């Protein structure tokens, strides 16, 4: 027997929506702080440009989540047609952008470790800015064309074979991003544990590893289901699956928490500002033995 509360709101709908709103508000605050500090208070390096754009994508993605969950709780209905298409297209754009930024961060870090001379001497100065612009434009273009070919943008135009081919392309693109993310991460881990005795943990390395891990656990399932379920059960609106949406909200909320945790680890918080904590979390140089982060031990290295 299904439980309901006054106002005929289903508990199974209420709980996920409330969780999304709670995680969303926490994530909005955290990502807004990260964006403000990186955008206006800190000198931006190659990695910080990507993290700035990732924070923006997570902020907007959570904002869409909160709007959608609030509409569900208040029992409103989003207008049909172009408005609904734009709203859900924005969510997809932000998801693809977030995955692309994370893949770019991991790849950039991998290049800096495996090819340090080329990276520091020959890498074009504005590569990060150009890559971020390309990622935003490409993500937007992919989702708009998907809506056009599959009839979401124009109900009079729908070609199943073209729509199917385009969905295969999008799935292949997401798979490519996932493979790049995994391979670059594995290369970093192999380099750390097997290839270089003089390579030590840095806080930036720990931050990237934790961010990738959280995405694989919380962000990836929605992307897989979103595209693969089209072939298993055509016509099912995957974006409405509440557990996956809660996981994506956790994923977008987690990054600022990771930055705070890594940046404040073994530090005296009463003497740390948020800017100092964020700088520590994104620090790319090994610390002194007394303060080095040792993730596999409970004590600092003597």
Swiss-Prot record:
Domain of life: Eukaryota
Species in which this protein is naturally found: Mus musculus (Mouse)
Keywords of the record: Acute phase, Cell membrane, G-protein coupled receptor, Glycoprotein, Membrane, Receptor, Transducer, Transmembrane, Transmembrane helix
Membrane topology recorded in Swiss-Prot or TrEMBL: Multi-pass membrane protein
Physiological role: Orphan receptor. May be a receptor for RFamide-family neuropeptides such as NPFF and NPAF, which are analgesic in vivo. May regulate nociceptor function and/or development, including the sensation or modulation of pain. Activated by the antimalarial drug chloroquine. Mediates chloroquine-induced itch, in a histamine-independent manner.
Tissue: Expressed exclusively in dorsal root ganglia and nodose ganglia. Expressed in a subset of sensory neurons that includes nociceptors. Expressed in the subclass of non-peptidergic sensory neurons that are IB4(+) and VR1(-).
Keyword Transmembrane helix applies: yes
Sugar-modified residues: 2, 68, 159
GO molecular function, one term: transmembrane signaling receptor activity
Similarity comment: Belongs to the G-protein coupled receptor 1 family. Mas subfamily.
Extracellular side stretches: 1-17, 68-81, 151-167, 233-242
Localization per record: Cell membrane
Main subcellular location: membrane
Keyword Cell wall biogenesis/degradation: no
Topology feature Cytoplasmic, residues: 39-46, 103-129, 189-211, 264-302
Transmembrane segments: 18-38, 47-67, 82-102, 130-150, 168-188, 212-232, 243-263
Any Pfam family the entry gives: 7tm_1
Official protein name in the record: Mas-related G-protein coupled receptor member A3
GO CC, alphabetical: axon; neuronal cell body membrane
BP GO annotations: acute-phase response; cell surface receptor signaling pathway; chemosensory behavior; response to chloroquine
SUPFAM superfamilies the record matches: Family A G protein-coupled receptor-like (SSF81321)
